[in-house]
Amino acid sequence: MKIELDMYQTLALAVLVLMLGKFLRERVRLLDKFCIPAPVIGGVLFAIFTCICYVTGVAEFAFDDTLKEVCMVMFFTSVGFQANLKVLKSGGKAMIVFLGVVIVLIVSQNFLAVGLANLLDVDPLVGLCTGSIPMVGGHGTAGAFGPVLEDFGIKGATTLCTAAATYGLIAGSMMGGPLGKMLIERHHLLDTIVPEDDSLLVEEEIKHERHSSMYPAASFQLIIAMGIGTVLSKLLSLTGMTFPIYIGAMIAAACIRNLGEYGGKFTVYMGEINDIGGICLSLFLGMAMITLKIWQLAELALPLVVLLAGQTLFMILYVVLVVFNIMGHDYDAAVIVSGTCGFGMGATPNAMANMQAVCDKYSPSVKAYLLIPLVGSLFADFINSLVITVFINFI
């Protein structure tokens, strides 16, 4: 029996799955501890249900994912609005240095993924399913690039990317705090703590205050950026390279944001844009998760384990040997290490949870609380999308 859902029914089911995930996360402490997104919790359960139905021959589900693409583009447009060059400049040398460290991390994750895939004699694009797409990118980027890789002939790429992203969330949360603690105690870093000015954090918080009357204007800015983005995407396609559908919208949004910041002729309503983007991300993830075909993971189970183990070992070595030393070899650097594990293998909320755990035990770190969310949220996703696009087109 085949059960077909139109785009409205698919959206409604995604919302129900989202609500189920939120309900379970509020009641299962472990899910909340690891910051597992509500759409992932409910979506995995539904995907298991559809897998059982498929394997037993009871039913097969077919979904209309038209609205999934709309929500995906709107979310990544909101990410594009985060690319504020003024913030990058105000962060000073430390911001530039950390951004460079993150760029190297993104590129290295993909080189490692492709290299291990070649050693395992699997398609390099399968390797990319465990690279920076799910690691730095998380579930949002996994859901966006999975279909792109499927268009290149990688069956079940979305499922692979999502499985890797879920693993990354858990692994990044589990190792961030312990690594930070180890570095602090091994190198006696409490002696390196110095008082810092938190005015930049306060300034950003004020800028992102929400006003209900501004949500329509924020929506219009998002829609305009999406419209301009379609033109940019068509122009980019003339290069012969394959780009994700949202890349033009991200570039348009970044241009609008910086025109507003530097020109001063109009206001970009970032708080409201962030909220709308967050809603679209939840809906996009909900629809992406219910369409997972987890039975496609079976034949790639062993390569997937090896690829993810390689990424985990690399992350530990990278943050301890590179991030810690380049960022100052002090207490702040140790807290940054814990945060980098969070967003380098999962998402920025995991990074913040890791840092909070370390800071609650020892001392606050204004530097870490400034760098991690700004680089992790504002610039990492934007740069990651560009790097992934290059890898997909040239391997």
Report each predicted region and the residues it spans.
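Alpha-helical transmembrane segments
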Residues: 69-70, 161-178, 242-249, 307-314, ...
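Structural signature of multi-pass alpha-helical membrane transport proteins
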Residues: 2-65, 81-86, 203-205, 217-272, ...
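Hydrophobic alpha-helical transmembrane segments in multi-pass integral membrane proteins
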Residues: 51-55, 110-118, 143-149, 283-296, ...
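Alpha-helical membrane segments and immediately flanking helix-loop junctions
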Residues: 116-160, 167, 179, 194-195, ...
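Membrane-embedded translocation segments of transport machinery
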Residues: 230-308, 314, 319-326, 339, ...
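Entry/N-cap segments of selected transmembrane alpha helices
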Residues: 70, 84-114, 219-222, 275, ...
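Small-residue-rich segments of transmembrane alpha-helices in multi-pass membrane proteins
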Residues: 40-50, 99-111, 132-138, 200, ...
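Juxtamembrane and boundary regions of transmembrane helices in multi-pass small-molecule transporters
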Residues: 115-122, 165-202, 313, 321-331, ...
